[in-house]
Amino acid sequence: MQFGELAKVLAAVESTTQRTTMVKLLTSLFKKAKPEEIDKIVYFILGDLRPPWEGVELGVAEKLCIRAISKATGLSAAELEGWYKKSGDVGEVARRALAAGKRPTLLAFAQQKPLEVAEVYDTLLKVAKAAGEGAQDLKVSLLSSLFSRASPEEAKYIARFVVGKLRLGVADMTLIEALSEAFGVSKEGLERAYHVYPDLGRLARHVAEGRPLEEIKITPGVPVLPMLAQRLSSASEILAKLGGTAICEYKYDGERAQIHLREGSVKIFSRRLEDITHAYPDVAKAVKEAVKAREAILEGEIVAVDPDTGEMLPFQELMHRKRKHDVAEAMEAYPAVLYLFDLLYVDGEDLTTQPLIYRRLRLSEVVEEGGDVYIAKWGMFDGAEDVDLFFHEAVSLGTEGLICKSPTSTYEMGARGWNWIKYKRDYRSEMIDTVDLVVVGAFHGRGKRAGLYGAFLLAAYDPSTDMFYTVCKVGSGFTDADLRRMYDMLQPLKIPHRHPRVVSKMQPDVWFVPQVVIEVIGAEITLSPLHTCCIGAVKPGVGLAIRFPRFTGRYRTDKRPEDATTTKELVEMYQRQKKVPTT
């Protein structure tokens, strides 16, 4: 496929505000693609070269990209940087430069072979792999070779891709729906395969080649989508939901981790499927010593501890571990302990279809506790008073509360169901709990906040429609540093119109691709005619909103937008808070 054909589809996807139109455009594109190029097309649409756990990054900032455009067009870098300062879009700079800069003669241009998708992808992969002395010059040379042969529209999307600002915001589920339509494959089957092996490029090629989805199995070294929990505010409600008996585990305030042991090496993946092994070499070493298996996939929580007292520290302390440099110093200042709570695979045996009580038994057989690896404290209960006692014990020891699970439940990858239920201490507040919401828009700041965003439009996620619905406008709780950080985080996501996956009655000054997730608390959840969250769920024509929302200071960089608080959860929180007596 010629890259120009892909660029036309990207332009159409970018301009639409209708998700159904987006699916139709992608379906048509996939039908035309060859099996050997469809994976590259999918990766490009997602803005990635490879799946997240492989950690392949282009390492190209705007200035380097502008150097490449300058080399290809003969326009000065200074002039191009001036254009960039005005537009803020390196893609627009590339489009304009290719339209205005020196071009081949008409004859030479006619004889020039059009760019192919595979050629663009392979060149970008070379850019990503360029390292060591002279790497920057090599990156510029490779990129300029693409720009010199690209049309203005092609150059726009190549430039945006290389700086990580493609701005399409196409969701994984949208791509799955389009693949299902294009190849006549069950959408549910594709979703199941994606949960087991969440590499959409590989999945697209698999179905394009006509291979059965049953071939895709859980594989050590490839993270699966984690199972997620619902929430309730009382032990009696939790037990009723779980059929009268629950396995309750401490809910540690740390970083959820999926640990893969394979051929003597350990990989640690975040809930966003990124390889974070570099941040926890001590944990990886401890896993090798503690896990008595050749191959295994385990789940747990990495918790920071005080090196002097051994007491658990808040989740935020683990952020010191994320720096690529000074890891040794961070390990000493912020030691970490791993608390394991599930075993998904061991030595050729897929345990995800086995009941939790069996997985727990196998976990205790496989793990030799000690050092920095432990099994999360748990118990099995059938009485609300016993659950509450265990809950208070957990909170007093510095945890967030409990995760209560059905003893007979299988491991449902990527699902948020009622087999796992959170019971957290935050449920004692009026609003019952904090919520994690997605930033979809912003309002310009005034006075001290001039030049930045003064407030943000936040939305909850509805997995049944794959859409985001607004629930509040928040401007409280942000420090000056927070406002600057939010501005810098959101600028690359700025788009000229409401995103097709966002439903909003409010009109902010600026719209964004839904990607940034932040934690918010409020006084209560109220009925609102201004917001679209859960319209009609409680009262006809009226949605839900958070009253007096406030940013807690916690950026949920560990969560994808699809991991945000759901609209269904907000309805349940609204209904439960009615039972809390006011004082």
From Swiss-Prot:
Family classification = Belongs to the ATP-dependent DNA ligase family.
> Which reactions does this protein catalyse?
ATP + (deoxyribonucleotide)n-3'-hydroxyl + 5'-phospho-(deoxyribonucleotide)m = (deoxyribonucleotide)n+m + AMP + diphosphate
What would be one Pfam family of this protein? Answer: DNA_ligase_A_C
Function recorded in the entry? DNA ligase that seals nicks in double-stranded DNA during DNA replication, DNA recombination and DNA repair.
Instruction: Answer yes or no on keyword ATP-binding.
Output: yes
What positions constitute the catalytic site?
Answer: K251
- Write the record's keywords in alphabetical order, separated by commas: ATP-binding, Cell cycle, Cell division, DNA damage, DNA recombination, DNA repair, DNA replication, Ligase, Magnesium, Metal-binding, Nucleotide-binding
* Protein name as it appears in the record: DNA ligase
What GO annotations for molecular function exist for this entry? ATP binding; DNA binding; DNA ligase (ATP) activity; metal ion binding
Q: Under which EC number(s) is this enzyme classified?
A: 6.5.1.1
Q: Which GO terms describe its biological process?
A: cell division; DNA biosynthetic process; DNA recombination; DNA repair; lagging strand elongation
Q: Which residues bind ATP per the record? A: E249, R256, R271, E301, F341, R416, K422
**Keyword Metal-binding recorded:** yes
What SUPFAM superfamilies does the record point to? Answer: ATP-dependent DNA ligase DNA-binding domain, DNA ligase/mRNA capping enzyme, catalytic domain, Nucleic acid-binding proteins
* Lineage of the organism: Archaea, Thermoproteota, Thermoprotei, Thermoproteales, Thermoproteaceae
Q: What top-tier enzyme class does this entry carry?
A: ligase
Listed PROSITE patterns:
DNA_LIGASE_A1 (PS00697), DNA_LIGASE_A3 (PS50160)
What cofactors does this protein use?
Answer: Mg(2+)
